[in-house]
Amino acid sequence: MSDDLSKRSLRELVSQPYKYGFHTDIENEEFPKGLDEDIIKEISKLKCEPSYMLDFRLKSYILWKKMSLPEWACLTYLNINYQDIVYYSAPKNSTKLDSLEDVDKKILETFDKLGIPLNEQKKLANVAVDAIFDSVSVGTTFKQELSNVGVLFCPLSEATNKYSTLVEKYLGSVVPIGDNYFAALNSAVFSEGSFCYIPPNVKCPLELSTYFRINNENSGQFERTLIIADFNSYVSYLEGCTAPMYDKNQLHAAVVELIALENAEIRYSTVQNWYSGDTNGKGGIYNFVTKRGLCAGKSSKISWTQVETGSAITWKYPSCILVGEDSVGEFYSVALTNNYQQADTGTKMIHVGRGSKSRIISKGISAGYSKNTYRGQVKININALGSINNSQCDSMLIGPYSQANTYPYIQVSNAMSRVEHEASTSKIEEEQLFYFLQRGISVEQAISLLISGFCRDVFVKLPMEFAVEADKLLSVKLEGTVG
């Protein structure tokens, strides 16, 4: 196969249009740009929050002002002007919605177009959705059906009043307000997110899902998710996100906290498809996210599964703190970068409890001029006797200009535990593609098959609703690549 065909195919494959880049023309209610204590107080007032929430926010803001940006990541980006961001933006009258019937027709059409129907006739079977548009939740499906079995699933702003005992107890318990620069910012200004509580001995009958949509060009999105799985319970949670195509960068700084009590299990799956910028690296979302789970009880389990294909910048490390005896933490990830995208992502597995186990499978795919970094920490404490970790980090390079980096940090403080780590780097070779062509399979189909096989260990961990979507998404993102 000629070099010209190879390079042309690669360019075509990594330059597929972003089909979610449309803007919804709708009237907004928004705060002026900038951040100070008055803005924070206004957010709290608008949400009718109890006093403990305002205290939480103001303490976070004071801490944030004293903190510095983390500079250790393999990322290069323009300085963010935090006074040039709108910290609250919502469709007009959205704070007065009593049901989905009251939601603006344009917003319902937007979510229909995104494949997330909210109205009663079209809503997804077996998936309860909380739809968040800029700074507010515009609707939650199947709330009554979930309530019938004791599952609480609602916007976080609603939970701060309705279920204040749970929120006050667990909010900030896994990700403290001063954990890092972006977590502190989120703790000060978050305006929406999802809350979920699974009562003892209940297996949630539906998949729970939150879909995040940024629409306003001047706003950032700062959602917060809090999930608590009580004794012997189970929940599977899905997360998706998209944004319009704008020439300037927008900030997304989220926090996710998971708490699994004794014998409880939480599966948290993400398909991240924020706008990644154009082929020259202009525009796109700056995605700075803190996700952490606490396996608090004996035999508890938390699994993170993610497919990262969007964002101009991704800084994200879903992690587990394994406190419970025989607790389990898992991290399965596919991170795809192309054009000028940069991703610095990975996980932490902190073993505290005896007999705790963790597994890490990370697949990084780099194309175009992009940079893809895996950063992982495995720490086994002195009292975590009999703990086991297995890590597998594989990178694939497509084209001559992309980069892949792996930074494992391993610390074992007792002689009764075991850590296994393996890593590989590969690239799609012309010889492989030649064999496919000899069998009548096009270059695009060949690359899609090779990528699917490379990512299979992660895709099989996704719920069925996401697995098919993720496979298609990678094919679209890399449709036409190489040679």
Swiss-Prot record:
The biological process GO terms on file are: iron-sulfur cluster assembly
Please provide the record's keywords in A-Z order.
Chloroplast, Plastid
Q: Name one GO cellular component term.
A: chloroplast
Instruction: Tell me which InterPro entries the record gives.
Output: Fe-S_cluster_assembly_SufBD (IPR055346), SUF_FeS_clus_asmbl_SufB (IPR010231), SUF_FeS_clus_asmbl_SufBD_core (IPR000825), SUF_FeS_clus_asmbl_SufBD_sf (IPR037284), SufBD_N (IPR045595)
- Where is this protein localized, as stated in its record? Plastid, Chloroplast
Record's keyword annotation contains Cytoplasm: no
Q: Which family does it belong to?
A: Belongs to the iron-sulfur cluster assembly SufBD family.
Name of the protein this chain belongs to: Iron-sulfur cluster assembly SufBD family protein ycf24
Q: What's the source species' lineage?
A: Eukaryota, Cryptophyceae, Pyrenomonadales, Geminigeraceae, Guillardia
What gene, per UniProt, encodes this protein? ycf24
